[in-house]
């Protein structure tokens, strides 16, 4: 079984920090915030093996770029697979217009 290095971009880390802050501070639920953060972080770390088990985006140009999406609760982890490396680019709230958010950030 091939193992991949999982690289999390600064932008994805900022997304995770923002989701933690939103739940902990704005929703006043710090325990829930930590639980959600930990579930996402744990799921991201599983991308070190078989990262292609999650589907590609259906829309373009993300599909052609090889951008995958992994759903964790109400959040979507966006990532690309290169030889030996999985790069997590975004962690987005699933209820948002995902295609538009990715387009705004990367194009």
Each model region followed by its residue ranges:
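Enriched for short, Lys/Arg-rich terminal
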Residues: 27, 72-76, 80-107
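Basic/aromatic recognition patch in beta-strand/loop cores that engages polyanionic ligands
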Residues: 50-84
């Amino acid at each position: 079984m091939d193992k991949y290095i999982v690289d999390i971009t600064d932008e994805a880390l900022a997304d995770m920090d923002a989701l933690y802050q939103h739940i902990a501070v704005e929703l006043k639920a710090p325990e829930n915030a930590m639980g959600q953060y930990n579930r996402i972080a744990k799921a991201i770390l599983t991308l070190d093996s078989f990262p292609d088990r999650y589907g590609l985006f259906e829309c373009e140009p993300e599909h052609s770029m090889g951008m995958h999406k992994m759903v964790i609760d109400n959040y979507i982890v966006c990532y690309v697979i290169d030889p030996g490396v999985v790069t997590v680019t975004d962690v987005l709230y699933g209820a948002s217009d995902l295609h538009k958010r990715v387009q705004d950030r990367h194009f």
